[in-house]
A protein has these predicted regions:
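Conserved PLP-anchoring active-site segment centered on the Schiff-base-forming lysine
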Residues: 106-161, 167-169
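Hydrophobic alpha-helical segments that mediate membrane insertion or helix-helix packing
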Residues: 86, 104, 120-121, 134, ...
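Structural detector of well-ordered beta-strand residues that form the stable sheet scaffold
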Residues: 96, 121, 142, 194-195, ...
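Active-site region of PLP-dependent enzymes
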Residues: 4-24, 31, 201-207, 214-268
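Active-site phosphate-binding strand-loop segment of PLP-dependent enzymes
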Residues: 148-245
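Small-residue (primarily alanine) positions within well-ordered alpha-helices
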Residues: 95, 104, 108, 139, ...
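Conserved PLP-binding active-site segment in aminotransferase class I/II-type PLP enzymes
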Residues: 1-100, 107-110, 188
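Short glycine/serine/threonine/alanine-rich loop segments
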Residues: 92, 139-140, 192
């Protein structure tokens, strides 16, 4: 056995690294032209199409800015740039990029404590993903009637609250922002978390506050059919560090990537 292989120090302490580099490229499952034929169906501009083709033809997928968040050695990946953009635009402390608005909702509901037997009050009208994400988090959606705006009616919420209720999930529908003042008043009175579904109202405001920054967590979709379209993707915003870390654990399949991975937890 070589002297290197008998090294007792951890890589962190200067010992042998388990992986020092990646050689070669895997064969893609589909060709660039086939991918572009699919992308073309979304009706994107020629500039957007050219940008997507440049990414698809790049040789830096594994170690470049597009897929690598942790091992590329870059100061900022494309996902991290997207998260930074979300923080800057909406003034939130934390942001988490996901593969869809539904995934953002799943992360959010798990973060606020939804689980087996726990209930989340959702609007009776809206996209199915809101309630589906509650079920995905092992919770039970309870449907609340809507008012003339077609958004959740704050006056109808209290009758639905039980000892199992942990959160409200107002959905800002078709660009219309919910009555967040009324919804937040009920949530504060009963000690409930609020997860805003902003998939259809990105940029909408309630007074001086952006939709998605009023409750505990805001969840956005950037699919090709949304107000801000990016092909497919989602974004979670919050000002609560603990909620962000819990949501990030879901996104990372149970991992917890702190800025310093070896730091002690910052909460009890």
């Amino acid at each position: 056995m070589s002297e290197q292989r008998t090294e007792q120090r951890l890589a962190l302490q200067g010992g042998l690294k388990a992986v020092s580099g990646v050689e070669g490229h895997g064969k893609p499952k589909i060709g660039v032209d086939e991918l572009m034929a699919v992308v073309e169906r979304f009706g994107l501009s020629s500039d957007a199409m050219a940008g997507i083709r440049d990414i698809a033809e790049a040789d830096t997928w594994g170690g470049g800015p597009f897929l690598a968040n942790y091992y590329s050695g870059l100061d900022e990946s494309k996902v991290q740039a997207f998260e930074r953009c979300g923080r800057e635009i909406f003034g939130s402390t934390y942001a988490l990029g996901t593969n869809s608005g539904t995934a953002a909702l799943h992360c959010a509901f798990t973060a606020v404590g939804v689980g087996p037997g726990k209930e989340v009050i959702c609007p009776a009208i809206g996209f199915f993903a809101t309630a589906a994400a509650v079920v995905q988090a092992k919770g039970i959606p309870v449907f609340c009637d809507v008012d003339q705006s077609l958004c959740m009616d704050p006056a109808k919420i209290e009758a639905l609250i039980t000892p199992r209720t942990v959160a409200l999930a107002p959905t800002h529908l078709r660009g219309v922002v919910c009555d967040m003042d009324g919804i937040m008043a009920v949530a504060r009175k009963h000690g409930l978390r609020v997860v805003e579904d902003v998939a259809q109202a990105c940029g909408g405001r309630c007074g001086d506050e952006y939709a998605g920054t009023i409750g505990d967590v805001g969840c956005f979709s950037i699919s090709a059919y949304k107000i801000v379209g990016g092909g497919e993707g989602g974004l979670l915003l919050t000002d609560d560090e603990r909620l962000w870390e819990r949501a990030n654990q879901v996104a990372e399949c149970g991992g917890l990537w702190r800025p310093d991975r070896f730091a002690a937890p910052r909460y009890e």
